[in-house]
Amino acid sequence: MSQSPIQNPTSDPNAQSVQETSESKYGERQIAEGTLITFPNPRVGRRYDIHITLPEFTCKCPFSGYPDFATIHLTYVPDQRVVELKALKLYINSYRDRYISHEESVNQILDDIVAACDPLEITVKGDFLPRGNVHTVIEVHHQK
């Protein structure tokens, strides 16, 4: 059985490196365009909790530029509208290149979700991975 040799991408004259392409990838475009989308609550009048965990949150420290990593925990009681999950994922991913503090990022997430779906109650918790031997947990709450 013969195997074809593995081609070195740099030996292909038509290959382009990521740095050489000026067109953004479809995922980057979706993230850049990402806005929170909502839909009607299917059970208006019934009080229930929605728990969402987003374990891949990243942003950049506004002072050092180093990346910060966190798990974002959302718990909310919807009123008339519910946040669509793919839109929420793309919205969260939009923070990856932003220079923003732990405190501001968690507060901004809460403000944006409240503006999008006006829940009866919401808690947003950012559990940031330790950096420099410091572990930070930021929790904010809003209630009508």
UniProtKB/Swiss-Prot annotation:
CC per GO annotation: cytoplasm
Region spans: Disordered: 1-27
Catalytic site: 61 (thioimide intermediate), 68 (proton donor)
Record-listed E.C. numbers: 1.7.1.13
Main subcellular localisation: cytoplasm
Subcellular location: Cytoplasm
GO molecular function, one term: preQ1 synthase activity
Name used for this protein in its record: NADPH-dependent 7-cyano-7-deazaguanine reductase
Species this protein is from: Acaryochloris marina (strain MBIC 11017)
